[in-house]
């Protein structure tokens, strides 16, 4: 296996063992730089990420890598700045990603390059860390060419392509929303990569809302707020991921409001992603909500069967692994939640087959994914837990779902609860009616059918149901 395959398989294994926050903030932006003589060198972009990996995830990371490669592995975590320090005295050219600027408290010795080898005489491969850590800003693998287009994401793909070809023009801001692992981050990176391919002098910055918040906190602590503002307000294209996490953070929202205004008034392009539409982000300031709605809002839906099949075939080709059509079909039918889990399942199957020297068959896939498929069969969640999740999502009390209140702000959440109870539990219509204040089973049937019909035409409602379902999956530990 090459480094990319090893790292993807490791991430797939760790995704189910770590919190979403740790996975997104610490693991996904990291990169396996080399694996030589039993030492895996992991590259990260900041001291915060390094500290988080070493303090919270070092043991799980070491164990996962050991399982993937089949022999004991030690882990070293290295910061991109270590390799960049010899060059940082030169002024960066336009288009250079400012996230790689050196931190004053990084004290590790500089490491100009790394080698990777399999310990069996394979030629060492030189890796330029600055290029490798571009994945912390723009991942060169995430392009429009590598994005599989289907009915679930065609509009989002077209809008992103239009922005990349004409930044600062139409669809500003562009707001993408949808569930976890559906390709929003891929599209953000694809925009940035295409913009820079067409004009390397354009300043592009990809950043998560969490990093924006952390940078602001650090700037305030170090009394460097002006430097922070210069960094974020002197760019041509801002790509900001998971904006929902700034909700409820007053200082972050205030700073982002002014950043947005500065960039937008200068005809700089802003592309934002979220797991829900602006109207559904509770505690988001109204002035930000209205600005997010100035441009185009597009939802990214879960892939249909044809798209899942195409994604798996493209992934197998990228991995240079032959996967029989019947196995592709098996995975496409079994893994329906999101693209990340779909690709992760193929990584696991390929790694399992290689490590056990087995052909890739449906039996091999079933064995490799036994825990995942077993969870799908055994998964249970209480009806009360679903009611709690629904009520928290809509900002109401569970008792309001049970009451006779017929105002729309309660009726819709109640019908969503009926629908999800029917879909996610084995409760009968009568059981659901009793749970919701003794309602007749025909009322429950009407509510379920109404939501089932409207999610096909109402993108806002569909995103609401998707977001709630994701919380249900997280509670199940899937």
Swiss-Prot record:
Sorted UniProt keywords: ATP-binding, Cytoplasm, DNA replication, DNA-binding, Lipid-binding, Nucleotide-binding
GO MF terms, alphabetically ordered: ATP binding; ATP hydrolysis activity; DNA replication origin binding; lipid binding
Residues that coordinate or bind ATP: 181, 183-185
Assembly behavior: Oligomerizes as a right-handed, spiral filament on DNA at oriC.
NCBIfam families according to UniProt: DnaA
UniProt free text on domains: Domain I is involved in oligomerization and binding regulators, domain II is flexibile and of varying length in different bacteria, domain III forms the AAA+ region, while domain IV binds dsDNA.
Name by which UniProt lists this protein: Chromosomal replication initiator protein DnaA
Organism field: Chloroflexus aggregans (strain MD-66 / DSM 9485)
Native organism taxonomy: Bacteria, Bacillati, Chloroflexota, Chloroflexia, Chloroflexales
Gene: dnaA
């Amino acid at each position: 296996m090459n480094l990319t395959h090893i790292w993807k398989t490791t991430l797939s294994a760790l995704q189910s063992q770590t919190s979403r926050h740790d996975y997104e903030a610490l693991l996904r932006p990291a990169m396996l730089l080399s694996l030589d003589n039993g030492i895996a060198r992991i590259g990260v972009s900041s001291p915060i990420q390094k500290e988080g990996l070493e303090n919270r995830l070092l043991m799980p990371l070491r164990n996962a890598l050991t399982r993937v490669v089949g022999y004991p592995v030690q882990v070293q975590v290295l910061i991109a700045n270590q390799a960049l320090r010899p060059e940082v005295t030169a002024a960066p050219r336009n288009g250079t990603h400012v996230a790689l600027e050196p931190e004053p408290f990084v004290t590790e010795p500089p490491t100009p390059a790394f080698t990777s080898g399999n310990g069996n005489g394979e030629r060492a491969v030189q890796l330029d860390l600055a290029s490798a850590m571009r994945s912390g800003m723009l991942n060169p693998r995430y392009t429009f060419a590598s994005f599989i287009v289907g009915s679930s994401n065609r509009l989002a793909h077209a809008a992103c392509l239009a922005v990349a070809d004409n930044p600062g023009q139409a669809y500003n801001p562009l707001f993408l929303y949808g569930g976890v692992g559906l390709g929003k981050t891929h599209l953000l990176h694809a925009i940035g990569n295409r913009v820079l391919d067409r004009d390397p002098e354009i300043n592009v910055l990809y950043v998560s809302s969490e990093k924006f918040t952390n940078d602001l906190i650090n700037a305030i602590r170090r009394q460097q707020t002006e430097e922070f503002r210069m960094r974020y307000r002197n760019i041509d294209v801002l790509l900001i991921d998971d904006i929902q996490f700034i909700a409820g953070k007053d200082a972050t929202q205030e700073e982002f409001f002014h950043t947005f205004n500065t960039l937008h008034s200068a005809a700089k392009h802003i592309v934002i992603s979220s797991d829900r539409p602006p109207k559904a982000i509770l505690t988001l300031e109204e002035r930000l909500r209205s600005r997010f709605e100035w441009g185009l809002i597009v939802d990214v839906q879960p892939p249909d069967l044809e798209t899942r099949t195409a994604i798996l075939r493209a992934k197998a080709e990228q991995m240079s692994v032959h996967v029989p059509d019947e196995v592709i079909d098996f995975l496409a039918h079994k893994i329906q939640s999101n693209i990340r889990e779909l690709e992760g399942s193929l990584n696991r199957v390929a790694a399992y087959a290689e490590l056990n020297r087995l052909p890739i068959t449906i039996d091999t896939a079933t064995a490799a994914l036994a825990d995942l498929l077993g969870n799908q069969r055994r998964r249970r969640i209480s009806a009360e837990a679903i009611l709690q999740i629904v009520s928290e999502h809509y900002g109401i009390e569970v008792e309001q779902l049970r009451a006779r209140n017929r105002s729309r702000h309660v009726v819709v959440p109640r019908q969503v609860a009926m629908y999800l109870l029917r879909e996610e539990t084995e409760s009968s219509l009568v059981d659901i009616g009793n749970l919701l204040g003794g309602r007749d089973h025909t009322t429950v049937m009407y509510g379920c059918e109404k939501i089932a019909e409207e999610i096909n035409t109402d993108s806002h409602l569909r995103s609401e149901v998707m977001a709630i379902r994701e919380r249900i999956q997280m509670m199940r530990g899937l």
